[in-house]
């Protein structure tokens, strides 16, 4: 398996099935801003609600091979082996990436257990060997990786964009970011000491960038302490 993240924004993705497994796939695709099409005679209440709200397209019938045409990615998420096989064949003929529930050997890709912290995306995969173990590891990450990591990721991204435009060497830029990561900034953010974190950013980047303006533009502003 080759680890990769896919940009599915606006791409047509097909889910065949209407139960709990299909529901999980649809939720993940919507989180990735994909254009989701669903084919199933029946839907779970949650999926039906999404269809009625217009968030997904729903064909209320059995799957036919033509459904695969134009799809970038396809999930076969039914409990019927013959349907799963039919979806697999149609996806392969259409040149789409395909994932077949409970058939890891037939899949072009596996869906990892995912932890999202805004723009920060962490995933755990076991190559299909044990989704349950992946879920346990994800839960452990969720306990250890708090919202302060997402805050730091936003901050670093906001600094990186203007810094890349400056006539500095690659090693010099890397050293600046390393000064950030080698500090206690994560702990400061975790403790609500945002003013201390902002002061450190100013100390590292203030001679190069308009740090105050950059910080004020972030959703985490104002950079004042939130804990006494």
Can you say where each PLM-predicted feature lies in the sequence?
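Hydrophobic, well-ordered beta-alpha structural blocks that scaffold small-molecule cofactor pockets
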Residues: 1-50, 228
């Amino acid at each position: 398996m080759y680890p990769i993240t896919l940009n599915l924004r606006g791409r047509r993705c097909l889910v065949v099935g209407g139960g709990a497994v299909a529901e999980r796939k649809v939720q993940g695709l919507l989180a990735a801003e994909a254009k989701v099409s669903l084919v199933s005679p029946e839907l779970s209440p949650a999926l039906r609600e999404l269809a009625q709200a217009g968030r997904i397209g729903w064909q209320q019938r059995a799957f036919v091979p033509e459904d695969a045409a134009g799809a970038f990615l396809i999930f076969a998420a039914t409990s019927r082996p013959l349907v799963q096989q039919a979806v697999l064949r149609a996806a392969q003929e259409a040149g789409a990436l395909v994932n077949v529930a409970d058939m890891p050997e037939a899949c072009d890709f596996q869906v990892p257990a995912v932890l999202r912290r805004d723009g920060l995306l962490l995933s755990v995969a076991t190559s299909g060997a044990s989704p349950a173990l992946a879920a346990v590891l994800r839960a452990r990450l969720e306990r250890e990786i708090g919202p302060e990591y997402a805050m730091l990721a936003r901050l670093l991204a906001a600094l990186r964009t203007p810094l890349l435009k400056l006539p500095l060497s690659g090693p010099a830029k890397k050293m600046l970011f390393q000064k950030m990561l080698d500090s206690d900034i994560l702990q400061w953010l975790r403790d609500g000491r945002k003013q201390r974190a902002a002061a450190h950013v100013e100390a590292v980047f203030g001679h190069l960038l308009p740090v105050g303006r950059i910080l004020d533009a972030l959703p985490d502003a104002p950079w004042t302490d939130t804990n006494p």
